[in-house]
Design a protein with these regions (language model features):
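Cytoplasmic-side transmembrane-helix entry/capping segments in multi-pass membrane proteins
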Residues: 56-64, 88-93, 114-126, 151, ...
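Small-residue-rich segments of transmembrane alpha-helices in multi-pass membrane proteins
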Residues: 62-70, 120-136, 179-192, 237-242
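Structural signature of hydrophobic alpha-helical transmembrane segments
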Residues: 24-37, 83-97, 144-157
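Short, structured motif recognition centered on aromatic/hydrophobic residues
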Residues: 60-64, 71-77, 150, 154, ...
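C-terminal ends of transmembrane helices
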Residues: 42-51, 74, 101-116, 161-172, ...
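Short, strongly hydrophobic alpha-helical membrane anchors
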Residues: 1-28
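Loop-to-transmembrane alpha-helix initiation sites
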Residues: 88-92, 144-149, 176-185, 199-210
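The first (N-terminal) embedded transmembrane alpha-helix
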Residues: 30-43, 61-64, 187
Length: 242
């Protein structure tokens, strides 16, 4: 039977490759890109400081929190030379500055009343924005549509995954509660549907995707919308909690 199945599969004609989407340029405004990098580095440095890490540890957490997704995108998937964050000194300078601020005035910064709201807003906008940037670069590299979606999701949430692994925590995307990864995937699928399915201009589709994901993320934060464990395993999950 296995031989027969393999013979039938071998006789089938190869599937045609998926046509790539038009790779029109889409880039984030530099002030947003640098601003988001700085704030995410600040957030990562705060986490490292709260864990009691030494200066190298705080700097490492700040680095992966802010640009880890881009490093994974360029180094693992696109492989088109050194990652962008290493070709421009501005990113590393901002990460170092954020770490220095935490070392000097970390206790005062974390007491700022509006810091969580600012970080939540940047996170909401950046979730869709960096997903779109990752997909655009994947399109320019000629990747298939499933690969384009994968690169977009990794670019959006890869930094958080690396941060959790580095800090020996379960990645948040594996746990119920957060919707970041689900919304990033939804945004990538929405972008592909708009541009490929509805033939919308790629730049317009990018901004629509960013707007939709930003609104959904802010609504989830505002109303406490979260994911849940699978129904049949909820009791088991509760028993395993420390």
């Amino acid at each position: 039977m296995p031989v027969l199945v393999m013979s039938v599969l071998a006789a089938l004609p190869p599937l045609p490759p998926l046509p790539p989407l038009p790779a029109e340029p889409f880039t984030l405004p530099p002030y947003f890109d640098y601003g988001a990098t700085f704030l995410w580095a600040l957030s990562g440095a705060l986490l490292g400081a709260r864990r009691g890490y030494a200066i190298p540890g705080i700097l490492a957490v700040a680095f992966v929190s802010s640009v880890g997704g881009g490093v994974l995108r360029d180094g693992l998937f696109l492989q088109n030379g050194p990652p962008v964050v290493l070709r421009s000194g501005g990113y590393l300078l901002l990460i170092a500055l954020a770490t220095l601020l935490i070392l000097i005035a970390g206790a005062r910064i974390q007491r700022q009343r509006h810091l969580p709201q600012i970080l939540a807003l940047v996170d909401a906008v950046g979730l869709g924005a960096y997903a779109v940037v990752g997909m655009n670069l994947a399109l320019a590299a000629g990747l298939s549509l499933p690969a384009v979606v994968l690169v977009g999701v990794v670019n959006a949430v890869g930094g958080g995954i690396l941060r959790d692994v580095l800090m020996r925590r379960e990645p948040s995307m594996f746990l119920p509660g957060t919707l970041e990864e689900s919304l990033a995937l939804l945004g990538c699928l929405l972008f592909v549907a708009l541009v490929k399915g509805l033939a919308i201009n790629q730049l317009l589709g990018a901004w629509i995707t960013i707007a939709v994901i930003t609104v959904l993320r802010l609504l989830a934060i505002r109303f406490g919308i979260s994911s849940k464990p699978l129904h049949g395993f909820r009791e088991y999950c509760e028993r395993q909690e420390p």
